[in-house]
Amino acid sequence: MNKTTTKMKVAVVAIVVYLAVGNVDSSPDVMKNLCLNFGKALDECKAEMNLSDSIKDDFANFWVEGYEVSNRDTGCAILCLSKKLDMIDPDGKLHHGNAMEFAKKHGADEAMAKQLLDIIHNCENSTPPNDDACLKTLDIAKCFKKEIHKLNWAPNMDLVVGEVLAEV
């Protein structure tokens, strides 16, 4: 696995964890374990949906304050990963039970998991309707990013990537 691919997979891990109501605890051990689980899923989503490599930049820079994610394919990738992780119900809404269990399984306590669920639920309800599920997911992701930055919970991707690369 080359350094760029590893960096992209680590970024995907961080984003999926946060977007799918994962864990705001960005400890290297948690991130490394998640990377092993999500890297393959991202590759599967890219192949299944014929997604372009342009999503790499969005995943690598997602948490950078001021970076604007606007690529529809990124929304499609997030949606696909969320489905693979059973984080959304058949209507495309967050599956609260599965998301809560996922968050707690990866280190979030009850209060943190509930707060993250509330943020995503509020973002689902506050983003404008969109018949394009990928663009709707992208809007929810951007809302979530904004709220996480307000809480100062955004991960420092340079530190996370550095820790994971040291383990590879």
Swiss-Prot record:
Tissue: Antenna.
Pfam family, one: PBP_GOBP
GO biological process per UniProt: response to pheromone
Xref: SMART domains: PhBP
Signal sequence residues: 1-26
Molecular functions (GO terms): pheromone binding
Stored InterPro entries: Odorant/phero-bd_Lep (IPR006072), PBP/GOBP (IPR006170), PBP_GOBP_sf (IPR036728)
Disulfide bonds: C45-C80, C76-C134, C123-C143
Keywords assigned: Disulfide bond, Pheromone response, Pheromone-binding, Signal, Transport
Family under the similarity heading: Belongs to the PBP/GOBP family.
Summary of subunit composition and partner proteins: Homodimer.
Functional description taken from the UniProt entry: This major soluble protein in olfactory sensilla of male moths might serve to solubilize the extremely hydrophobic pheromone molecules and to transport pheromone through the aqueous lymph to receptors located on olfactory cilia. PBP is also found in sensilla from female M.sexta antennae.
Name recorded for this polypeptide: Pheromone-binding protein
